[in-house]
């Protein structure tokens, strides 16, 4: 959560949430006044998270962030995507950006965590990885900050407005 500031009361989407680990961290960060939507295309992961998160401020949904998610337009303060962007095709990148823009509030933020583009003990081949500069060029949103996340990851923050 370093680099995101206070999330108290915010509405957050954890896109491609997997088992919901980060969704649970966001749940505590947004508090009772906020809400976390956990989205993943894997039905079994979402069903397990629904059972685990019952009675919390987490709403677990099956869906694909690279297509129309049916989520309400301009409703999210933050969209978070962790270590999956490198696997998107060019069409999926376009779909992802379009859907993120649609569901983010004006001035809302997009946070993408990716693996650094150098040899690491884990992660995809180097030719699949994005440097933070390549990631900034790949999207038309306004880049805000690049934050180191440990030794092997970084988070690129964007604002939901077009680059000048």
Each model region followed by its residue ranges:
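A short glycine-rich, Lys/Arg-flanked "PGG" loop and its adjoining helix->strand segment in the class I
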Residues: 94-106
């Amino acid at each position: 959560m370093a680099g995101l500031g206070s999330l108290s009361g915010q509405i957050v989407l954890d896109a491609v949430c997997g088992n919901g680990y980060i969704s649970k961290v966001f749940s505590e960060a947004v508090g009772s006044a906020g809400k976390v939507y956990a989205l993943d295309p894997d039905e079994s992961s979402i069903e397990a998270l629904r059972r685990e998160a019952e009675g919390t401020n987490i709403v677990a949904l099956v869906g694909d962030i690279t297509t129309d998610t049916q989520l309400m337009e301009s409703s999210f303060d933050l969209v978070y995507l962790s270590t999956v962007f490198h696997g998107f095709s060019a069409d999926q990148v376009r779909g992802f950006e379009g859907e993120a823009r649609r569901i983010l509030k004006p001035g809302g933020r997009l946070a993408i965590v990716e693996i650094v583009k150098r040899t690491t003990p884990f992660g995809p081949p180097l030719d699949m990885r994005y440097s933070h500069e390549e990631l900034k060029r790949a999207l038309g949103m306004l880049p805000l900050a690049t934050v180191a996340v440990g030794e092997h990851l970084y988070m690129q923050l964007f604002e939901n407005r077009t680059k000048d």
